[in-house]
């Protein structure tokens, strides 16, 4: 069974950046004012959540234990499982670490930097 994947919080954060940017444009087009600073708060919540799952060495695990604590009968090969901590899976997981950096960079830029303009134009703007 799979457990909580931290990197998916980062991917959700990127989705929310894209959604927020389109929502702001629509609100402004409809004549409403939108406070982008308020909308920034939840973007940082995703980044903070990812950081809280990091271990003592600030490495983000592949999966996090999401059940009550479970003591291991064989500590040599299987770690104790503690709620909110890594499951003993890959740590650091390069994908999780990269997603954290991508989300932080995209938050700072205010947009998803890895979305090619041609893709944005076709699927968001409707320009072909």
Which residues are covered by each model-predicted region?
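Non-catalytic carbohydrate-binding regions of carbohydrate-active enzymes
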Residues: 1-99, 107-128
């Amino acid at each position: 069974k799979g457990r909580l994947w931290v990197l998916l919080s980062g991917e959700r954060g990127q989705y929310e950046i894209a959604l927020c940017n389109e929502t702001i444009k629509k609100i402004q087009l409809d004549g409403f004012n939108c406070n982008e600073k308020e909308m920034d708060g939840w973007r940082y919540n995703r980044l903070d959540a990812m950081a809280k799952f990091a271990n003592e060495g600030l490495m983000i695990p592949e999966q996090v234990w999401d059940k009550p604590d479970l003591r291991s009968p064989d500590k040599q090969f299987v770690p104790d499982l503690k709620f909110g901590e890594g499951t003993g899976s890959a740590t650091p997981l390069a994908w999780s670490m990269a997603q954290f950096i991508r989300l932080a960079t995209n938050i700072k830029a205010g947009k998803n930097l890895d979305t090619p303009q041609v893709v944005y134009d076709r699927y968001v703007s409707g320009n072909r």
